């Protein structure tokens, strides 16, 4: 949402503030959708909320970890929109690829580690 607000305001996201480097913005503006009905999307979309994690790929795969001690689950949303069939054991390479991409995203966006949590 921040990228959209900055775009609508005609502003630019700063690289520094008071001499301090600012973490680059990771999002993309939704303004092109409002203007043209189309926008180039991300290859992946990740989120975390109270230790529940999810990572969606442009090709329809979704990686889910429903809690800190839970195992990663993998779903093919093209064939299973209601996420009834966990395919993590059937497609371990795809799961591992997406876990690696999630971890890279989480580190880049400073999603993890949480304050007070030890780094892995």
Question: Residue ranges of each PLM-predicted region?
Answer:
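C-terminal cap/loop subdomain of S1 sulfatases and analogous C-terminal strand-loop tails that border
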Residues: 2-77, 108-112
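Short, conserved loop/turn and helix-capping segments at secondary-structure boundaries
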Residues: 24, 88-92
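Short amphipathic beta-strand/extended segments with alternating polar/hydrophobic composition
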Residues: 63-65, 86-89
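Intrinsically disordered, low-complexity polar regions and short flexible loop motifs
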Residues: 80
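Short amphipathic alpha-helical coiled-coil/interface segments
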Residues: 91, 95-102, 106
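Short amphipathic alpha-helical segments at helix boundaries and their inter-helical linkers
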Residues: 99-100, 110-114
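Short, charged, surface-exposed hinge/linker loops at domain edges
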Residues: 114-120
């Amino acid at each position: 949402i921040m990228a959209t607000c900055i775009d609508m305001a005609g502003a630019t996201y700063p690289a520094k503030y008071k001499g301090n480097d600012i973490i680059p913005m990771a999002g993309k503006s939704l303004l092109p959708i409002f203007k043209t009905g189309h926008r180039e999307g991300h290859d992946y979309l990740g989120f975390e909320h109270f230790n529940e994690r999810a990572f969606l790929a442009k090709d329809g795969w979704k990686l889910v970890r429903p809690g800190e001690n839970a195992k990663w689950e993998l779903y093919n949303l093209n064939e299973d929109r209601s996420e009834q069939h966990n395919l993590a054991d059937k497609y371990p390479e795809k799961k591992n690829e997406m876990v690696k991409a999630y971890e890279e995203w989480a580190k880049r966006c400073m999603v993890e580690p949480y304050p007070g949590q030890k780094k892995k």
